């Protein structure tokens, strides 16, 4: 017979690296603890259908990891969360710093400098895709502008000999557009056809193109530039992107936006310090305001910046070896699909395969494990599986487990909300666990709408102009017209004598 004391020794062992996440589903007085070291360094996955309690499990687990309620705690914990739907900003507000593309007064603005992206990803976004010949025209000019930039502002670790098109060196997209459009539209006059027929010089800063005399037939010209690459269409799209306010967090990144000479107020060290070096244990990157067309690229860029920085600084005190980092990836199936082939997918595969050596751990969170790359999922040493109804998803989870544990997955369709089967390196034995619920004010913002209550209420005045304003601005808190209210004290009228 297994006694309660035996169960407590098996599942509730106490140690420096043990964190409590809940209790046995069959015995509420027996805690379930996981090894923090194994949970972070050997990666983990939290999987479950919509409504199974994934978000609550993540919020509860992160609070357990940082040990806020313990005397010693984990003041040096470092967790980076990619929050796709903005669910965790309230749930973790007391232990996190929030960066958002559409920040409110309690959040910091999220900026991801475009010049830190790989050239291929950047060009694919700002031009809509290029042929090989057209891409060369852009990459050659980017290298030229970056080279000019490091000559004006020398940067540690790089010079003209080691510079590549992918080097994270500031350059001006406005200057790139201006110089390329100038070359494409130039016309010439003169006997040797080498005198530019310029009428107005334009302005790179305001994205006004230079104006040349129009091409004319005959011996006098003006003559077109025969060396032009035929890239006016992608240049027009680049200009449109630069003018689109929805992409300011990427193309106009605050202090990280280069001027026309490539000079920036802040370098990447300040960006990393903001994300990873503040006084809270958790950093939430709220991506709910990011347009879907750029979301995957943005996530890939964030992960690349963070991982490359920690990889190359592994011998330093700020590196991952001295101060490990846990990256929590919500809605992972959206950017880690088996056929994704994106920067995000490639970086996460690197983290999954080699992150343990450099102190970077991954926590994959998904409602569709079947749509997550098998390489990534198979590298997760700990599986926290909540209710899963889809047989394809269950089969994918089964495939990550040893044969003798596959039978446990037959329980997944009947688990209660907030119940999970935990297997892997962080758990001493496979266990059916009831996850500890955070208090009401620390629950994620993922509740279903109260349909009956909402439909039973009398309709109030509806302003669909506000709906359209939010749609156009891509901000949920947009207003139709800002009102200025002037408040002045009321003066008593003099009494009649």
Language-model features and meaning:
Residues 100-104, 111-116, 383-392:
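Conserved AAA+ ATPase "SRH/arginine-finger" region at the nucleotide-binding site
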Residues 82, 329, 365-366:
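Hydrophobic residues in beta-strands of the RecA-like P-loop NTPase core, especially within AAA+ ATPase
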Residues 191, 206-214, 297, 417-497:
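Conserved P-loop NTPase motor module
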Residues 18-102, 374, 422, 454, ...:
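Glycine-rich phosphate-binding loop of nucleotide-binding enzymes
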Residues 128, 344, 350-434:
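Conserved ATP-driven motor cores of ASCE-family P-loop NTPases powering translocation/secretion/packaging/pilus
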Residues 1-23:
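Charged, amphipathic alpha-helical linker segments immediately N-terminal to NTP-binding catalytic cores
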Residues 86-92, 96, 115-347:
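P-loop NTPase motor domains
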């Amino acid at each position: 017979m297994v006694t309660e004391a035996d169960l407590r020794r098996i599942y509730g062992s106490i140690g420096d690296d043990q964190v409590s996440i809940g209790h046995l589903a069959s015995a509420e007085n027996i805690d379930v603890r996981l090894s923090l070291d194994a949970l972070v360094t050997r990666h983990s996955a939290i999987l479950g259908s919509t409504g199974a309690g994934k978000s609550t499990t993540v919020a509860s687990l992160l609070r357990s990891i940082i040990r806020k309620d313990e005397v010693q705690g984990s003041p040096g914990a470092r967790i980076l969360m990619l929050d796709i739907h903005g669910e965790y900003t309230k749930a973790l507000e007391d232990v996190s710093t929030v960066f958002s593309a559409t920040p409110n007064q309690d959040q910091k603005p999220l900026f991801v400098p475009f010049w830190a992206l790989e050239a291929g990803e950047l060009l694919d976004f700002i031009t809509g895709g290029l042929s090989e010949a057209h891409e060369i025209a852009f990459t050659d000019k980017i290298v030229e502008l970056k080279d000019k930039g490091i000559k004006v502002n020398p940067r540690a670790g790089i010079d003209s000999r080691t510079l590549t098109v992918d080097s994270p060196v500031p350059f001006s997209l406005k200057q790139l557009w201006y110089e390329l459009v100038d070359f494409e539209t130039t016309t010439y006059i003169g006997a040797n056809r080498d005198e530019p027929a310029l009428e107005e010089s334009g302005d790179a800063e305001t994205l006004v193109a230079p104006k040349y005399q129009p091409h004319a037939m005959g011996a006098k010209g003006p003559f077109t530039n025969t060396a032009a690459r035929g890239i006016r269409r992608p240049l027009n799209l680049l200009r449109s992107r630069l003018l689109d306010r929805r992409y300011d967090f990427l193309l106009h990144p605050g202090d990280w936006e280069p001027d026309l000479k490539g000079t920036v107020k802040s370098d990447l060290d300040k960006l990393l310090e903001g994300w990873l070096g503040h006084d809270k244990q958790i950093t939430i990157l709220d991506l709910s305001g990011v347009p879907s067309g750029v979301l995957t690229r943005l996530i890939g860029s964030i992960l690349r910046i963070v991982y490359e920085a920690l990889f190359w600084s592994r011998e330093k005190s700020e590196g991952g070896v001295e101060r490990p980092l846990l990256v929590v990836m919500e809605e992972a199936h959206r950017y880690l699909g088996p056929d994704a082939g994106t920067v995000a997918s490639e970086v996460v595969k690197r983290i999954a395969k080699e992150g343990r050596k450099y102190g970077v751990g991954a926590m994959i969170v998904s409602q569709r494990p079947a749509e997550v790359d098998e390489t990534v999922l198979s590298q997760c040493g700990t599986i926290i599986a909540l209710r899963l109804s889809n047989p394809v998803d269950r089969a994918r989870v089964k495939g990550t487990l040893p044969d003798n544990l596959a039978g446990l997955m037959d329980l997944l369709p009947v688990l209660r909300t907030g119940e999970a089967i935990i297997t892997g390196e962080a758990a001493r034995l496979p266990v059916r666990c009831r996850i500890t619920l955070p208090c009401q004010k620390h629950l994620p913002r993922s509740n279903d709408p109260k349909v009956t209550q909402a439909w039973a209420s009398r309709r109030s005045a509806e302003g669909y102009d506000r709906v359209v304003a939010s749609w156009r601005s891509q901000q949920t808190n947009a207003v139709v017209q800002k009102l200025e209210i002037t408040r002045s004290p009321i003066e008593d009228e003099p009494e009649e004598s």
